A protein has these predicted regions:
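Long amphipathic alpha-helical coiled-coil segments
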Residues: 173-192
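N-terminal/domain-start alpha-helical segments
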Residues: 205, 209-210
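Acidic interhelical loop/turn segments
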Residues: 132-155, 185
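Heptad-repeat amphipathic alpha-helical coiled-coil interaction surface used
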Residues: 111, 118, 122-125, 132, ...
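Amphipathic alpha-helical dimerization/coiled-coil segments
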Residues: 80-130
Length: 210
């Protein structure tokens, strides 16, 4: 799949390997990740296959950089892939894998794990909101534009935001239900057995629901 992500980016503009790395860390990070060490070997393979063409660009005071462009063969390969039906993707979520066996650790430790994960997704959501704000300030609402590139970029960003919101809501619900479960099973006050940060989240969730 990495090659198709690269072809997609190159279909928009010429990019160096370093610029591709930056794009993977920004515009498409919310649905596809790639390590720097993966990008250059893949570019080399794709160049050998004729899907991209590299051109060395000299610079007066900086090192010469190699800029890549998608070829006609690369465009055909990308379009062929775009027209293929996509199956449901296998989900790999380490947090959910742990959650499946959280009965093996104390509830307060499980609560800390969930609360920490919520914090991470809060940060990620904030990052996507910043991207959304910058995009809107520069180009207007991407979902109301007549530019097809901006429109589809906007849709994928909308997905990323919705995913983070869903995950945060799940974490809050899980903390609330865990507190109730612990009180039910052990017969202790949920607030006494839930870490302080998680208590605040649970209390906030309860207040919002009320």
């Amino acid at each position: 799949m990495l090659r198709f992500a690269i072809l997609e980016l190159l279909s928009h503009k010429l990019l160096s390997g370093y610029e591709l790395k930056k794009r993977f860390g920004g515009s498409i990070v919310f649905f596809w990740r790639a390590a720097h060490s993966q990008i250059y070997p893949e570019l080399k393979r794709m160049e050998a296959e004729g899907f991209v063409a590299g051109d060395k660009v000299p610079h007066p005071w900086r090192p010469t950089k190699k800029v890549y462009a998608i070829t006609e063969a690369g465009t055909r390969e990308l379009v062929r892939w775009l027209r293929e039906r996509t199956d449901i993707q296998a989900v790999k979520d380490e947090m959910m894998l742990k959650c499946f066996a959280f009965d093996l650790i104390p509830p307060e430790e499980a609560a800390r794990q969930i609360d920490h994960h919520k914090t991470l997704h809060d940060r990620q959501l904030l990052r996507y909101r910043e991207i959304e704000r910058d995009l809107t300030q520069k180009h207007g609402d991407p979902l109301q534009t007549s530019d097809p590139i901006m429109f589809w970029n906007g849709l994928t960003l909308q997905y990323a935001i919705a995913f983070e919101q869903m995950y945060i809501e799940w974490c809050m619900s899980a903390l609330s239900q865990l507190a109730a479960f612990h009180a039910r099973v052990v017969g202790l006050g949920a607030r006494a057995e839930t870490p302080d940060r998680a208590v605040d989240v649970v209390a906030g969730a309860g207040g919002a629901a009320a």
